[in-house]
Amino acid sequence: MLNVNANSLIYPFSGQITDIRKNQFIPTSKFINTVINEPIFLTKQKVRTKPGTSHAPRKILEVNPSWNNTFFNWNTALRNPSTVLPSFIYERTESSTSKKSHDQETNQVLINAEILNRKLPQFIKQKFGYIDKRKGGYVNQFGFWALLYSEFCLKLNVPIEYYISMLNLKTQDNNIFLREYNEVEYALRYLVRFDELIYTNGKGRKFIKLPSSGKLDFSVDVEEIENVIGCDLHYWTLWPLSNTYTVQGSGILNHGNIVRGICEFTNELVAAHYYPTYFYEHYLYFEDVSNLIKHQIYNVIRTYKAQLKLQDNLGTNRLERRGYYLTMFCPFFEKYKYSVVDQFGELYLYLNMFGALPFDSADSKSIPKTYNDFDIYYQDRFKNFKDFGYVTYNTTIPNEYKRRNLGPYQLFFTYQQMFDLIQTISTNVNLMYNFKILGFNMMDISNINEIDTNVTSVCRNIEYPLGPSLHLNNLEAIPPNLLELANNVTMQFNSNFLSPYSMYTLPLMRSSAERLIQEDGLRLAVFRLSTAHRKQLKTLQKQVLDPKVLFDRFIRPNLIRCQIPKFEFLFWITYCVDEFPMYTISSTGDLDVTPLTSSDEKRKSSVTNNSSFKLLCMAFQFLSEFGIREIVKPNSVLFLGAKNEPVGDMLRRLSHGLWSVQRVGADAEYPSKKANINNVNLKNTYDLVISDMDQSTGTTVEAISALCVSQLKKCIECFNRRLVFKIQYGLFHTLCAIRDCLIECGQDYAGQNLYFNMKIVRSCWSKVGSMELFLILDKTKTEHELYTVDQLRAVVNSFGFSETNTVFYTYMGTPSRYQLNDLNCKIFSVDVTVNEFSDVLSTFMNLSNCVSYGALKNEAYVDTLTIFGATNIQRIGLFMRNKQIYKSLALDGKDHRPEGIFDPRKCFVIPGAREVLILSDAQRMKAWKILKKMHFDRAVLDTSLTIYDIGCRDFECAYLAVMDEDTILPYVGIDKSTILDVKRNLTIERREVNRTELYRLATLGHVFVYNSYFMDFPTRAKLEEELNYLYDNLVLKGVMLMSFYCLHDELLPVLKDHGFVDISSKDVKENKFSFGRYHGFGTVDYNFMLEWLTKMSQKFEVHTVILSASDISFSCVMHGNAINLDSIYFAPIFNMVQPCFLIKNK
C-alpha cells in the first residue's frame, strides 16, 4: 500500500515575502538596446527520440527573457503576427490565412517568428530610438509593456509622454519608486486614464484588466504550439487601482487581506497567487472552468520544473517562489465542482484539491509536455483515486475545515512530498497542518521503494540557502572542528596535539535511554533550517584545512627536530605533501619518519576536497588500531561515494604502491569508476571499505533510513576486515534500522564463524554543524554484542543533545543582545615595543587566564614583542570597574579573525580546560543569560539589590552581577578561605555561612549558592532534609541561584566508567558523589528531585538551567577555552547529576 498522505495547510502564509523582481532595476539605455537589438524568439534544433521513430531534429522556440514580461499572446502572435504588430507595419500574406498542411503550418510559425523578430524591435526603435539614454533613467517594465499592449492589441492611442514617463524614472516622485520598487503602483497612475482597461467587480472596486495568455515560459516544439501545457492559457490579471492590502508603514503584503479580497468577487472564477507577481496585490480572472483547470495544471508542471531546476543546479534562482506557483481559488469555486467533473473528470477535481504530483524521475523528459500526455499519466498513475471518491471529500474533512466554514481562508491540500519540499526550502512561511486524510491501495506496488528514496521526488538538504544570509559575526558559538586541534602553543610553537585522527566514542547513558530528548522529525527539521548557517562556514573550514596552511603550521616547525609523535607527523606529511613519505618500521613496530628534503620551490601540496581530511583520519585510525605495519602489507581499499577522492592517491603514496585503491561513485570522475552502488556488482572484497555516500535524497526519516540500509547491505558484502560507513543523519529511527540490518546479516555470517564488532563514533572533522556519525564495523572471530535499542537512544540523545549539533562558528568580537561590548571575548594579538611591554602585558593579564608573548624573529636583540591570547569573561567581569584597562586597550592592536587564513608566525590555538570546569562555566553563563532576560525583556530583576555569592571561591560568579556597562549590581563575596586580594574593588567577607545566615541573606538581596552550601552535606538524608526545609521556610527578596548533586541508580555505572569522572566505590554505595578527586558529598534521589521541583514550582517561579551543545560551546568561547567534545556529549548526564535552578517570587 502506498500511503499518499495529504496534509491540509491553512493559508495565508505568515512571514515576509521577497519580491523576485527587485533585482530587475534595468537602466533605460540597457532596456532599449536589448529590445531593439535582441530577437524576441530564439530558435533551436533539438533531437528527440520516441519509441518507433527516427532521431529527427525538432524545432524549439523560446521567448527571450527580455521580452518575457510583455502582455502579448505569443502563441496567437506566432499564428498571426497582426495580433501584436501595428497594422501599418504588418503586411498580411496569403499563407497566413489559407488552410495549410501540418508541415506548412510549422514552417509558417517559424516564418512568423522571423517577422516578429524583425518588425517589432524595428518599430520600437523608430518610436523610442531618439530618447537620450545618457540621462541614466530606469525603465518601468510593467507600465511600458502594458502601454504597448494597449496600443497594439486594443488599438488605443497612447500619448508618447506616457511612454517617456515609463522609460525615464528620474523625477522626485520616482525616487520613492526607486527605493521601494513598486513599479505596478507607479504604472497604474497612467493606465487608469484608459477607460477600456477598467474592470469593476461586484463590490464596486476598480481594477486594471490586463491579459495573461498563451505563455511560452518553457521551450516548446513548434509542431505542438497549440497543445503544449501553458501555451494556450487564457485569463485576465486584475490589478487594483489602489493597493489596500499592505501592512501599514512596512510595504509588506498582508496575505490574509488578499485572500479576503477574493470574496469581493461574487460570481467570478477568481484566484490569487501565494506570492503576487511584482509584489503587488492582484487576482487571476478566468472566464470558464476549462481555463481555470488548464492554469492549475500549468502551475503543477511549473512548480515541479522549478523544483528540478533547483535540485539539479543547487542554485538560488527565484528560490523564494519554489512550491508557490499553485493558486488558491475563491470560495465560490465550490459551485463549479460539477462543471470540473463534467469537463475533465473526477481526477482533475482532485488535482485541483491536492495541487502537486509526485513525479518519479529527475529527468525533465518524464514530465508531461502536453495535456494529452498529462491526462494519460494522471489517469494511469492515480486510477485508484476514484476509490477515494467524491463523497470522501465531502464527509472526511471535519466541519471546521470545510471551505464554506473557513470563509475567506482557503483549505489547501498538498502531497506529502510537496509539503516536505515547502518546509525544506522556505523559512519565511508558517505551515500549519492539521490532519491526514488519504490512503489508498496501489495496484502496482513495484515502485514503492523508488518513490521513497528517489533522488528527484525530494529536495536535497545540502547547499540550500534556506533563509537570508547570515554573517559569521551574527552567529553565537564555535564548532569543535576548528579549535580543538591543539591543547596549547608557546611562542616557539612547540605544540602538543590532540591526535588529528582521533574519534570520539559517544557515551552510552542508561538514564537517557528512556525517551528521546528530541524526536527525529524535529531533529531533522531543525537541521534543515540551519543550512544557511552551515553554508557560511564552508569557506572557513576549507581555509583551515588547506594543506599549505597546515604544512606551515605543523610540519615546518618540526622539520629539524620533530616535537610531535612520529605517527602524527606522518599523518601531516601524507595529508599536506604530494610526495612519497620516507619512513622505516622496525620488527617491533617502531616508526621513524625521515624529514622532508625537497625545497619549498619544488614541493607540491596535496590536492584535497572537503572530505579528504576526515577520510584520511579514518584510514589512520585503521592503522592506529590494527598496527603501523599494515602500511607495508598489500592491503586493498575501496572508497564508495567518491567523485575523485584524493585520499586514494594519499594512501598509495603512503604505502609506496603496496595498497590497491578502488573508487566508485555515482558522480565519479576518472580514475574513479562511475556507477550506482545499487546497480554495480562488487565481485571482490576489500580489507578496508570507506563509504562516504550521499544520503540526503530523502525528505522523511523513513526514506533516509531506507536508503541508508540499502547502502549498508552493499557495503557489508564487500569488506573483509573493517568497514567505515557514514551515517549522514544521526537519527534514532536510522540507527535502529541499521541495527536490524546487522542482526539480519550477522545470522548469515555466524555460520562462517564470523561476527560483527560494532562501534558508533563521531569524527571531530565532519562538516561543521552536521548530524554525521560513522559506523565502524569489524569482522572478527569473537562474538560481540551489538548496541541495544536503549543504547542507540542514548547515542542519539548524547549526539547533538537538544539542538542537533547546530554548533556554529562566531568571530569573537561582535556583541549580541545579551552581551556587553566590554565583556565581549576575542582573540587578541598586539605588537608592542620592549619599553611598553610590561605595562601592556599587565593589562592583558587582567583580561585573560593565559597570555603568550615572545619575539617573531630569532635574533640576539629584538625591539618588538608580540602579546597574544584569548580574553576570559570571568577576569573581565572581576576587573571591569578599572577604566584604565579600557584606555590601555586603545593600543593599536590586531584582532585575529579566525575566519581568515592563519598566519603561522602568530597562529594562536585556544587552550583547553577540564571538562567539568567547562560544564560548570556553561551552567553559570546560562544562568547569567536568564538573569539578563529577566532584566531586559521583563524588567523583573531588582538591580538595586546586592548579590551575596556564598562560597565564592575564585569569584567565578562575579560577572553575573554585570547587566550592561552602566548596570552593575552590588556584589559581596563570602567564603571562609579566598585567595583573591581585596584590591579588585570587590567586597569580600571571609566567614562561613550557616543555615540561619543563608535565609537571612535571602531576605536582603540576591543569593548565589552555586556549587557551595548545598554540596557540603555528608549524607543523602541530610541534604533532602535541607531542601525540604528550604521549601517550607524560604523567603526571597530577590533571586536565588542554587545547585546540588543528584543521582539515578542506573546512572552510577555510567559515571564510574566515564573518563573524566572519578568516584570511588565507597562513595557510590553511600549515595555520595563529587566531580574530580574530592571526597564524595550527599546526593538526592532523582525522583526526590522531581517531586521537590514540582513543589517549588507551585510556590515560586523556578527556572531550570539546562545546558545544550550551543550553551557549552558559547561558554567556552567567552571563557577563552577550546571546545571540548567530551563535555558536549556529557551534557545530558551533567544536567541530571548537577541540577541548577534560578528561583524568584511569582
Curated annotation (Swiss-Prot):
<protein>
    <recommendedName>
        <fullName>Uncharacterized protein VP4</fullName>
    </recommendedName>
</protein>
<dbReference type="Pfam" id="PF20831">
    <property type="entry name" value="Reov_VP3_MTase1"/>
</dbReference>
<dbReference type="InterPro" id="IPR048607">
    <property type="entry name" value="Reov_VP3_MTase1"/>
</dbReference>
